[in-house]
């Protein structure tokens, strides 16, 4: 039986696409009884609530909170202890190779659009992502665009890069949806869902909302997503708003699969 380790530390942090990707793939794969799945994260209870309990599913509690310590020491130790055959990592693999590795690189936007990312971020991740991509036994990405960009930036032939496309999450159509107006005070609204960072251009959306004075027409701007990279333009604009304007702009966090978001 194949032993497959999944680096699931992303489930310990804020909601993001990488988390949804892992959840989607392995919610489908865990039905394969000829594979033993080892999910590793600090919040094991959260993983259990998502992937459930089965004979072929195991959970490993991570001790390291520091990514360097986790990749340099903890994962090599786990791989040896549990005699793992394959390990699946997002973007960056451990310093030492102890088994066959699956690496998913979702995108290289910091290389495609460098002006939106700090120099230190670009230098560090270019080095680590390239090292991981070239060393991977199985290299995955999520779109043909990313596949071509990985080839271009890292000089890796396309036949080594496999696309595992992002998909729409299936939602139980029997869920009783709450009245959005009653629950959130929303009637007419504009919705955007993503982390708040410069390249997502929330600042332009907010500026347009204010310049058109849509709040005076009864509209609200609903932003679902955590503040990620510093967005000074957005923060400055938001702080300059009047109380009336701020009452029409709602910012809150929710899982991409959370009922709160589904309701909205």
Predicted regions and their residues:
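Carbohydrate transferase catalytic cores enriched for Leloir-type hexosyltransferases
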Residues: 1-262
